[in-house]
Regions:
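Divalent metal-dependent hydrolysis catalytic cores, especially in the metallo-beta-lactamase
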Residues: 64-90, 104-113, 153-163, 187, ...
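Metal-cofactor-binding active-site regions of metalloenzymes
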Residues: 42-54, 85, 101-130
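Active-site core of metal-dependent hydrolases
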Residues: 159-215
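Divalent metal-coordination and catalytic microenvironments
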Residues: 3, 28, 36-39, 76, ...
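Metal-associated gating/positioning segment near the N- to mid-region
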Residues: 30-96, 203-204
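Active-site mouth loops of central-metabolism enzymes
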Residues: 50-64, 123-143, 187
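Histidine-rich, glycine-flanked metal-binding segment
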Residues: 1-32
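Short, acidic/polar
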Residues: 61-71, 134-149, 192-199
Length: 215
C-alpha cells in the first residue's frame, strides 16, 4: 500500500504472510526491485547532430531530459541521480515529478558541476557555459556550492580531472568543497579519473567517486 518493499525472502518463507495479495507473474519471469542509476546527465545533448541548435534553447534540453526519463523508467530504472545539468534543468525536472506534471523515476540533481577555470566540463564560449560553475580558490568553491544549493541541488558535483595525469583542483580547494557541502548536511560526488585526483578525493572525504579509473 505504501509503495515500499514489504518483505524479502523465498516464496516458501513469505507465502503465508500475504495470502490475500494477488500478483500476476508471467511464466518463467522474475521480479526484482527497481534499478538505480547514480550517474546520468539527463539533459545531455552534445553528441546530437543538432547540438548547436539546442545549445541555446532550454526548452529543447527539457524535452530531451523528459524523453530520457521515460526511457529509463521503461527499462526498470526507478531512481536516477543526475550529475551536472544545464542551469535550472535539474530542479525543474524534479519539481515536475513532485507536482505530477510528468512521470519518471525518483530524481536527485546536482544542478551544475563545479570546475576550475578552463577545467573539465567547461566551454570556451561563456554564453553556453551552462553545465558548470567555474570556481577557483577555496572561497569561490564554497560560493559555488552555496549557489548550487540555492538553486535546489540535492547533491554537489565537483570535477577534478580530465585526461591529463594530475588533479585540476588543489587539495585545499577540494577540502573546502567537502566541508561546505557537509556543513549543510548534503553529500558530494567528484569526477576523478586519474590517480592523483582519486587520492585527493579520498583524503578530502567525498561521498562518492565518479569514474575512478585505476582503482
Amino acid at each position: 500500500d505504501t509503495g515500499m518493499i514489504a518483505d524479502v525472502g523465498t516464496w516458501f518463507d513469505i507465502k503465508d504472510l500475504y495470502t490475500d495479495a494477488v500478483v500476476d507473474i508471467k511464466e518463467n519471469s522474475t521480479i526484482l526491485p527497481g534499478l538505480i542509476d547514480m550517474h546520468v546527465h539527463i539533459g545531455f545533448y552534445d553528441r546530437r547532430l543538432d547540438a548547436n541548435a539546442i545549445r541555446h534553447n532550454l526548452g529543447h534540453k527539457t524535452l530531451i531530459a523528459y524523453k530520457n526519463m521515460q526511457d529509463a523508467l521503461s527499462v526498470g530504472i526507478t531512481t536516477l541521480r543526475s550529475v551536472a545539468e544545464p542551469e535550472g534543468l535539474g530542479s525543474a525536472i524534479r519539481a515536475g515529478l513532485h507536482k505530477g506534471y510528468i512521470k519518471g523515476p525518483r530524481y536527485f540533481t546536482c544542478e551544475r558541476g563545479i570546475a576550475i577555470t578552463g577545467g573539465h566540463g567547461t566551454r570556451h564560449d561563456e554564453k553556453v557555459q551552462d553545465t558548470v560553475i567555474e570556481a577557483d580558490g577555496e572561497w569561490e568553491v564554497r560560493k559555488a556550492v552555496r549557489q548550487n544549493l540555492k538553486d535546489g541541488a540535492d547533491w554537489i558535483k565537483v570535477l577534478a580531472s580530465h585526461r591529463e595525469h594530475y588533479c585540476e583542483y588543489t587539495l585545499e580547494e577540494l577540502q573546502a568543497a567537502v566541508d561546505e557541502v557537509h556543513r549543510f548536511n548534503k553529500k558530494c560526488c567528484i569526477h576523478a579519473a586519474t590517480r592523483q585526483a582519486i587520492e585527493s578525493a579520498v583524503i578530502s572525504g567525498f561521498d562518492t567517486i565518479e569514474h575512478g579509473a585505476f582503482l
